[in-house]
């Protein structure tokens, strides 16, 4: 028979004590002799059997023991130290040996049993046998050979920090010999309530998984299983819908599959569960949907609780971190002990720690000195302030009282302009659009751009704005009355006008002469031969190719005047310089719009005299038509910088700037468009131009827009009137 199923496994000797206050003598054990003798003790008559312990009484804590629950407790008859009781008043007929067996774990030596007092009582033998989960009360009897020991030793085991202490139950007034602490590798958890006090044969109740899941407290276990299974489903079956309800369905399914085939892997179990789920009706699924809803509520509540605990912990950690570390208490120094203030502080530290955060700053005030600003920093600050005071008003924003009185209006407007964040963001958005930038470049004042991009240390933007605004408010006649300094330095004679041509003021050609007078020093006399004129025209074409893109497409616009067919020369100027590409000229003051305004009245007079109105000019579809017709006739390769719209043929892709700037009328915008057509018309090569002799009054300066338009047409339509040509073009389209 296996000894581990019969006795407790103890690594050290056992001392057993039972109560018998009426006994006069004790039986002692002498471990030194092989067969020791003991003092005889009369055996008392049997005492009345006590009432068994009721189930509502608190039982003593028990631990798991290595005793089989189905077998009675039988003392082994192995050789050991016998306990002999000799006859007394009751006079037993024979001495019955009682062996106390000491057992230990394998591999450890057996230690001798020390002297122990044993008292026998007339109570039934009771032994509490714990199980794996619950503990039941077992009733066992001794063999028939030991009839005189018809009592049961009520022993209890009290766990104290991982040790066992064997003591008597119920307690006695005699001195009790306790067991030496013994460490056990088995579970010492306290069993659940309701597992004690049951009478009858030895019965051990174990909580199987079925019983655990059938109890109300198994909801928590199912909730944890549901969370784990839901994670597995999301990992292995991501395409599954209703993961929560399907996970609830898998709880019993996976349990059944695990019982039938424990070696089945998780993926196979999930696939089989999915097949069963697909075969389940919607009515049968309702219970799992309800369960999943409850579990989802539990999970959300748990997450909220966890977040709340994290917040509380973080707050506690911050509070602990902000509290200054307390210095360890020190013995008061003799010189400090005489001061009453320091003594009171010491007492407060020892009695009430809550006042420590309030007294801590007082110490700092006494020990630390206030921080002083270094003189170097003060000096540097003063230098920076002096340097800022030397900036003009536009940078620092600070103005003197006189300037504030004089320029109160413009300053307030500028401040509002720079302080409006929405306006600045809108301007940035517009500047990011290419079409808008091209439109602005067509009307922006080049003088303003030149001043902004210049390297001058001080720029008075307000004064420049005033000058430009004043210039724009002037009429064409007032602008034409302004003197040109180039005319004063160098004499420019105006040729007699053609009698058949309309009269144009002499100052109309002033801008062109003013710009070209500083570059060319050689004049050309009127009436040159046709050969000389043609050679010079060819030289002009060659020089047009050498003109840089900055001169052609820079911020300096051009002004080309249209002419009549009957009068090829509208403006006769004795000084004719080399045209700067497409008949353009350099222009420093004013803007393109301003220059177009100056010749507005003259162009309108020409249109009236030629019976051409601005509405007739707008009959053309777009600038793309002119670009396409002119560039097909160009024999030489035009640089890409010359015209950025070379590859464009759609009218919508080419910007048509017509801004409304301070009361600009639509007529003036149309004039600016006609001016732009004249610019593109100047690209007609010289080979296609008719070589008119001096008798026809050919001007060797820039060609007019009407001349360019006629030159671009075939020679057979050379002498057709303009109105007829336009009507034919309309019929063609």
UniProtKB/Swiss-Prot annotation:
InterPro entries: NUT, NUT_N
Region called Disordered, residue ranges: 187-207, 489-535, 691-733
Protein name: NUT family member 2
Membrane spanning residue stretches: none
Composition bias, Basic residues: 715-733
Organism of origin: Mus musculus (Mouse)
Signal peptide bounds: none
Family in the record: Belongs to the NUT family.
